[in-house]
Each structure stands twice: as C-alpha cells, then as structure tokens.
C-alpha cells in the first residue's frame, strides 16, 4: 500500500516542483464526476493523484504508480475543523460532496480524502479523551499510535507557493488555537492535534488552581467561626470551685496577641457578648456570692456564666441531677419558683455561714439567675389557724410583698411545716429544724417556735389525720391549709398546677395524679405538700 512507503511524498514533491501552477485551475474546473471517479479509483491508496486526468489513457492508469497522500492546506483544515466542532463528527454520504466543493477552492481534494479525514479526526479525539491527564507528551503519542495516516501527512511539506485565499463566509469563527503550527510539520502546514494537545494540557492546570483557591478560601472563612465558638463556649463544663478563667475582651472576640485565627468580619449584627455588655454595662447578671477567694473582675465570660442551659420543666426527682448540682444557670419557665430562682443575698449569707446544715440547698441554688423574684426576703406573717381543715383555699389573687423571694426553704420556714408530723410538733419545740438559721438572721416572721405552737394548736382542731398543704405561685405563697388525709383535687388550682411532697431541706417529690387531677393515693398523715401554680 502507498501508506507503507514513507519516501513517496518526498518523491512527489521533487517531481512536481517544476510544474507550473496553471495545471491546477484546469483540474479544479473539471466536472466533479470525473474528479470523484478518479478519487474513488485511488481510494485504496488513501489519496488523489494529479496524474489521473481526463486526458490520460487507460493504459497509463493501469500502470502501478505510487499515489502520494493528500496534504491538506491550512485553509482546508480550518473548514474541516469548523465542521467537526459543529457536531458533524461522521458526515453522511450526501454531505461529503458538499464539503469537498468547499475545500476545492483552496486545492485538489477528493471524497475519499474528506471521509478519511473525519475518521482520523474522530480517532484522535477518542485517544485524547482516554489519556486526558497524562500530559502533552502522552497525548501526542496516543494520537500518533491511533492514526498512522495522520502521522504520515504531518511529515509531508506543502508546495512553496500558496495562492491568496478568496473571501468566503466561514461556517464558524476560527479560533486562534487552531492556527498554531505543528512541531513536526513544515512552517506552512498546521494541525489541529497540536492545538488540541496544548489546550488540553492547559485546561486541567487551570482547574487545579481554581480548586486549590476554593479550598483555601473555604478554610479562611471557617477559621473565624471556630475561633468564636472556642471563645464563647469555653465556660461550659468548668466546676464552680475552680478559679474563673481570664475574661476576654468585650469588643474583640480574638485578642491581638493571638494571631492564630483571622479577625471576625465587621457587621451591623452584635454578638451575645457585645449585646450583654451594652445593656448591662459589663456587670454580672446574678448577684455575687461571698466566697473565700477574691471575686474576679467582671467581663464577658463571667457575665454570661450559665446563660445557655435552658430546661423547660424540673425533672421528676426534683433534685440531684447533674445540671442541677452544677448550678450553671438552670432556668425553668414557670413551675420551679420553689426551687430557688429567687435566692436572696441574705439567704446566701445564711447558707455560707452554716455549710454543714444547708449544703444541699447551697449546691442546688448556686449560679441560678435572678429573674425579678426579689433581692431581700421580708417578714411574711402567716396565720396558720385561719384556714379551716378540709376546705380548699382560693387561688391567691394578691401577690406577696413585691420583694419577697419564693423558695422551698422560705415556704417551709415561713409556714413552720418542716416538722409537721404529730410526733414532732410541740409547743415551742423546733430544735431539729434545719432552717433555724433563717430565723436567726430575721428572715422569717417572728421565731419558728411561735409558728410551731400555732401549728400544734391548729392540728387538734382539724382532727388527728390531717396533712398540711401550701399553695405557691409566682406572686408568692398563700397561708398553709390543713387538709384531711384523703384524696386531693389538684385541678382546683388550675390545669398546670402540680402537687409536690416536701421531704425536708430542699428535697421534694412529685405526687402522682390521675387524668381528672385527683391524687391516686390519699394524702399522708402529718406530711407537708406544696401546690405549685
């Protein structure tokens, strides 16, 4: 075959170099049928021969003469590349003559040449996709191995003279990458494979750089968020007895001496630290409790100590949970007023003075935020004998004194019901009362012994089997009620009311009720119950 002899194109160039150019217009002006017939006869050789003219004899055609390969001109390659890039990868038979007529304006070409050019171009595209990321050298080797005719025509050299191309409307605008000269061919020839290789090697590089920039940008954006979270959530999990950490700056989340993280961008939205500092002026939100160590300076960390722990309702046991014992800002919405949300400064002094008596109360109430229940506990006068036994008291409409704090300790000490059992109540005998310290500081009405005597005097009037019930709401505590040891209707005080049994100290337990709001078990004799509204 003609493709196996690689020296034939050079022979063809030296033989026809002295021929005048006037023979080609005659060939171009010949009928297309003769050209197509001659090119069809030379299809086996893979090209068109200039010797096959309508004036040549049959004997000359039968002589085995080497037929040179068709070397496309740059203008013809531009037209073919434009058609290939438009989507016509494998043109049909009726379209090949039309393409050939366009190419003949720049030089001789046959139908077979057009057909094989598209076949080779399609093979080069497939090989380029297979070896996409191997680099420019790998792509060039893959294209040469896949198409031997394409490698052969790169070595051919076009004639030295090139006619000026006429002005024709191109199918598509010519890209500058397609005009690059192949490194193997002569300066006048061009190839699309070189441009494809150069463009293919540059595009993955751009994609890699873009991807690297995107990852870097994402890390830069996430680092301030990590710094802010680290600064704001540092206080969680620290014990109360440990010395407080140095408070960070209020107006700068990231200190200037720690350039590890980027500065948080400025925005019109204030953070929680800035908002609290602007409203409260840098003060602590809860009252300072006296402690052996000197108090730390107010700052952003101490301001919001225990602000994030929010519980909807108290747990079933009512005491000794992990969050409860830690005391990090537990906040109940409406039914835990008896659990120490309004602990006053005087009560804090009492608990600190008697740690061996009120350890559980102090551990339960440390760190609870003040929500307007009062700062000091005034004298609340309670008349135990005013309520008749077995009659439900009305819901307290008028609140207690405006600065009265409502806690389990204050309710029990005020009502003198901590030792309400019949065996323990005696006139002027409250020696075992663990809340006697409150009376020593003058925080309850009179002495507890007088209230205990009133309770002892009221118990025989109500009968031997009675229980004490104290109604507690946000407004304050109502006078105690002596109720018979029978079933108790909690719904009388509202659908949200709860009944707790007082166990002493700050310990309470919920009393189970049925669907109608009546206690499952009757009230125990001598027990103390608290209705939370």
UniProtKB/Swiss-Prot annotation:
Region Disordered, residue ranges: 1-74, 125-212
GO molecular function: DNA binding; DNA-binding transcription factor activity
Cellular compartment(s): Nucleus
Pro residues composition bias: residue spans: 161-174
Residue ranges with Gly residues bias: 132-143
DNA-binding region: 65-129
Coiled coil: none
GO biological-process terms attached to the record: regulation of developmental process
Keywords carried by this UniProt record: Developmental protein, DNA-binding, Homeobox, Nucleus, Transcription, Transcription regulation
Basic and acidic residues composition bias: residue spans: 59-68
PANTHER family: WUSCHEL-RELATED HOMEOBOX 9
Reported function: Transcription factor which may be involved in developmental processes.
Name assigned to this protein: WUSCHEL-related homeobox 7
Source species of the chain: Oryza sativa subsp. japonica (Rice)
Gene: WOX7
